[in-house]
Amino acid sequence: MRNILPFLTRIPVKGDFEKARNELWAFPLVSLVSSIIPIAILYLRIPLANVLALLSLYFVIGLLHLDGLADWADGIMVKGDRERKIKAMKDLNTGIAGVFAVVVVLFLQVYSLSMLPFYAIYIAELNSKFSMLLGLATKKPLGQGLGAYFMEGMNGRQLAIGVVLYVLLYLPVVIYDPSALFGVMGLVFAWYVIRLSLENFGGINGDCLGAMAEITRAGTLVILSFSLCFTT
């Protein structure tokens, strides 16, 4: 897992670029690292815990995925053919669609966390990291960037190990609180982003993966919030 950490977090560890694509199966494991501080903040219920938990999460994982979400949203929303959409996504200037997407995702996360138990951020992060693994499993790269490089190393074995890890990491939370199982539905957002990416761009790049991570995390928290309303 050490080699994949520099690509998914800001943790100052030295990873081997060549070996990283052989550790894609470890994506779900990264959620243990990225969510530990937010979990502690939410568990202690300190003032503004929902805001501080989210800030601490982005302190660990960085803002690269949020930037990818903004670029992805600009590309999705622009009118025109596939070439024009890809050009808009790669534009260095962030458009109104990108700004709107980032604001909505942040708002949904902050508001949802104020209603949810401490472990919700862990489930959301687990889904977030697993969604990127699912995106890589499509083996449909867009361009020759980091996403394409990782897809070259993606295979059935890595996906199978990743799925097993996802289940094993999710299971303890379900044992603790069976209602946490509703969080699995958050993966529907991953599927939707993958579908939109393939339909609009014809492939998946780093921006698409970032959008998957952010939208899946926010969507999972929203689903858990609604499930809480119906189960209490």
Curated annotation (Swiss-Prot):
It is found in: Cell membrane. One of its GO terms (molecular function) is adenosylcobinamide-GDP ribazoletransferase activity. It comes from Pyrococcus abyssi (strain GE5 / Orsay). Pathway: Cofactor biosynthesis; adenosylcobalamin biosynthesis; adenosylcobalamin from cob(II)yrinate a,c-diamide: step 7/7. GO terms for biological process: cobalamin biosynthetic process. Keywords: Cell membrane, Cobalamin biosynthesis, Magnesium, Membrane, Transferase, Transmembrane, Transmembrane helix. GO terms for cellular component: plasma membrane. This is Adenosylcobinamide-GDP ribazoletransferase. It is an enzyme of class 2 (transferase). InterPro entries: CobS. It catalyses: alpha-ribazole + adenosylcob(III)inamide-GDP = adenosylcob(III)alamin + GMP + H(+); alpha-ribazole 5'-phosphate + adenosylcob(III)inamide-GDP = adenosylcob(III)alamin 5'-phosphate + GMP + H(+). NCBIfam families: cobS. The gene is cobS. It is a multi-pass membrane protein. The chain crosses the membrane at residues 24-44, 46-66, 96-116, 117-137, 153-173, 174-194, 210-230. Its EC number is 2.7.8.26.
